[in-house]
Each structure stands twice: as structure tokens, then as C-alpha cells.
């Protein structure tokens, strides 16, 4: 009996010591302020009874919203802004959670992307790490600048519109003379072809001009060095390479065919034959048929009056018609050596093509 009593007393003492250590830790966490310590513990007890509110998001709409914390914003200011954007139900509950978790002094200034499916804890921990503040944006191979502008609007996270970016894209290289000179780009050119297809992680404060600079820098990184030197050694400017590569990009389904399709077009150019490239007719039609890349007819080959229509205009079109991939660019710089002058999509829908030397052979491949 005495032994059991001693064990009980020992356990009780250890329990009291544990409580004391925990109390000291919490006291230290409250900056040694006894009033704050007591207040925090009372809030902690209150939150325990409201756990379901903490764990329940305000809605089901997962559309990202831009949310900005300015330098010097207090937890109360942040909470009120979240409430006004309909991201939380209770501003006071958010502030209380920050305080109990020790996050009220950890909020970082920046622009974040939040949605209604996030709980108060989710939002709180997002707002203490500025690394959560970014825009993911993808430019697809074969997209024209109008489609990039549409993607900007569809993304919904940029601080500018697609139309505002279009104004920058259409201005072209007026304030980038060194870039234009390096790649042989005429001063009249837009950014078409140079919005390098890639998935980008961008700062939320990026401007339309900043996006342009990022895309062009990525393009330069991809094509500079040996590729640029090899193109120039063949007597081609990079602008001419990108122009033809944009056509190859729109024609090819499989990257492995890029250098073969490129060889067809280069062979035609060498003998003065028109390129007869369907994508250039589509480009000339703009969005007149409700899509940027419409189906075309035999009549369109002659009736679409555009300098880009390579059925009625010899040589290369005035410039690129879309953003080519690096694979398409390399296909034009390093084409397969062939004696092909024609190609036709295979009838099985595989995306592959049949290549031929003569027009008569080409006709035999018609579906």
C-alpha cells in the first residue's frame, strides 16, 4: 500500500512538473507577457469548441482569387480583407487562430492566390510563406499571340488583361533593337513566334512588359549559341528559321517528323516553288470563322488575300505564324536530307504523313 502511494505521489509530481514546463513554454511564447499569456490560453479554450468552424471552408468555388498583404498590414486588417473577399466567414476567428498558433507576427507581404475551398488554417499557413505567391502559366506549342492573350484572361491571376498584353506584343521590338538585330528581326515585326512555349512560374506582380521580357529571355536561352551560329552559317537569320519552324509546328503532330517536314519546305524554297502551306492560309483568315485555326477549302488557297498565304506568295511569309517548339526550330536548322517535295497526312488518323518526290505520287496518297 505504501509503495503504491509513493508511486502515485511520484506520478502526480511529474504531472505537475509537466504542467509547469508547458506553462513556462507558453509563457515564453507569449513574449513573457502574463496578460497576453492568459488571453491566449482563454482564446485557445474558445477555439477548441469551434474546431468545426476552423475546418469548414466558406464555399466550394475553387477559382483562385488574388489576395494582397501590404507591408505593415496588421492581422486584423488582413482578416477583414479576407472577409470582404468572401474567403472566410469570421474575421475575429481568423485573428484568434493566428494568435494561438503564433502566426500573428509571421504574415508575409505579397500577393497570394486563395479560393473558397480553403479552411482558415489552410489560408493562415499560406499567408506566412511568400513562396506560395506565384502564377503558373503555360504557353502551348503552335499558339499565336491572340491565343496567348486569351490564355492570360483565362488564367485570371494576372494584374493585366490579355488585350493589354496584345498591345505589348503588337508593339514588337521597337524598344528592343539589340534583340531584333541579333536574330535578324525586322522593325515592323510583332512578337509572333517569340513567345517561347513553356510552363512558367511567375511572380504575381509581373507586368505585361515583364511577361514579354521573361518569354523573350527564355527564347534566347533556347536558341543562342550553337543553334544560332549554325543557322547563320547556312545563310539563314534566326527570324527566317523561326518563321519556317512555326509552319512546321502547325503541320507536324509528332516531333520526329519535324526535320522531314522541314526538309520538304526547304527543298521547295531551293527550287523556287511556293511553300503551299495550309497553316499560312489559316493564319491569314484570322478569327473570321470563329476559331484561330479553321478548316480551309480548296477555294481558300487562291481567295484568301493575305501576305501570309504561301499559295499565292512565293518564299517565306513576312514572319512567324505561331510559337514553334525547340524541336521544330531544330528541325529547320538541321533538316533530314531528302528529295521529298510533298507530304500528305496518312488516312488512318495517326497524325503521321506520307512523303513523296513527285506531285503524281502525292495524289496517290489522297484519302
Predicted features and spans:
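Signal peptide-directed extracytoplasmic domains
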Residues: 32-222
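Bacterial extracytoplasmic/cell-wall-associated proteins, especially those involved in peptidoglycan
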Residues: 20-27, 156-159, 171-367
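N-terminal type II signal-anchor transmembrane helix
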Residues: 2-54
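Short non-domain terminal segments
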Residues: 6-10, 135, 163, 306, ...
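Generic structural signal for short, solvent-exposed loop/turn connectors between secondary structure elements
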Residues: 1, 131-134, 366-367
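N-terminal hydrophobic or amphipathic segments with adjacent small-residue motifs
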Residues: 12-17, 66, 136, 345
Amino acid at each position: 500500500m505504501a509503495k503504491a502511494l509513493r508511486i502515485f505521489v511520484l506520478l502526480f509530481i511529474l504531472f505537475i512538473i509537466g504542467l509547469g514546463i508547458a506553462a513556462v513554454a507558453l509563457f515564453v511564447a507569449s513574449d513573457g507577457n502574463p496578460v497576453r499569456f492568459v488571453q491566449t490560453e482563454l482564446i485557445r479554450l474558445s477555439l477548441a469548441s469551434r474546431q468545426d468552424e476552423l475546418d469548414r471552408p466558406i464555399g466550394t468555388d475553387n477559382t483562385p482569387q488574388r489576395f494582397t498583404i501590404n507591408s505593415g498590414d496588421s492581422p486584423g486588417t488582413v482578416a477583414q480583407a479576407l472577409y470582404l473577399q468572401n474567403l472566410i466567414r469570421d474575421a475575429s476567428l481568423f485573428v484568434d487562430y493566428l494568435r494561438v498558433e503564433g502566426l500573428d507576427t509571421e504574415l508575409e507581404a505579397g500577393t497570394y492566390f486563395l479560393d473558397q475551398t480553403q479552411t482558415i488554417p489552410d489560408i493562415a499557413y499560406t499567408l506566412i510563406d511568400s513562396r506560395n505567391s506565384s502564377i503558373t502559366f503555360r504557353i502551348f506549342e503552335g499558339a499565336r499571340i491572340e491565343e496567348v492573350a486569351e490564355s492570360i484572361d483565362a488564367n485570371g491571376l494576372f494584374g493585366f488583361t490579355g488585350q493589354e498584353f496584345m498591345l505589348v506584343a503588337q508593339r514588337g521590338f521597337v524598344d528592343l533593337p539589340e534583340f531584333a538585330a541579333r536574330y535578324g528581326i525586322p522593325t515592323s515585326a510583332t512578337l509572333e513566334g517569340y513567345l517561347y512555349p513553356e510552363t512558367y512560374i511567375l511572380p504575381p506582380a509581373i507586368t505585361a512588359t515583364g511577361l514579354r521580357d521573361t518569354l523573350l529571355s527564355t527564347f534566347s536561352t533556347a536558341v543562342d549559341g550553337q543553334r544560332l551560329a549554325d543557322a547563320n552559317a547556312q545563310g539563314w537569320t534566326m527570324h527566317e528559321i523561326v518563321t519556317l519552324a512555326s509552319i512546321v509546328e502547325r503541320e507536324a503532330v509528332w516531333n520526329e517528323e519535324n526535320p522531314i517536314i522541314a526538309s520538304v519546305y526547304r527543298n521547295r524554297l531551293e527550287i523556287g516553288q511556293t511553300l503551299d502551306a495550309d497553316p499560312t492560309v489559316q493564319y491569314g483568315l484570322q478569327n473570321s470563322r470563329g476559331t484561330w485555326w479553321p478548316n480551309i477549302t480548296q477555294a481558300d488557297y487562291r481567295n484568301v488575300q493575305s501576305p501570309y498565304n504561301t499559295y499565292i506568295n512565293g518564299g517565306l511569309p513576312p514572319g512567324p505564324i505561331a510559337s514553334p517548339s525547340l524541336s521544330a526550330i531544330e528541325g529547320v536548322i538541321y533538316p533530314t536530307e531528302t528529295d521529298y517535295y510533298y507530304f500528305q497526312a496518312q488516312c488512318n488518323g495517326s497524325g503521321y504523313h506520307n512523303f513523296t518526290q513527285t506531285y503524281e505520287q502525292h495524289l496517290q496518297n489522297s484519302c
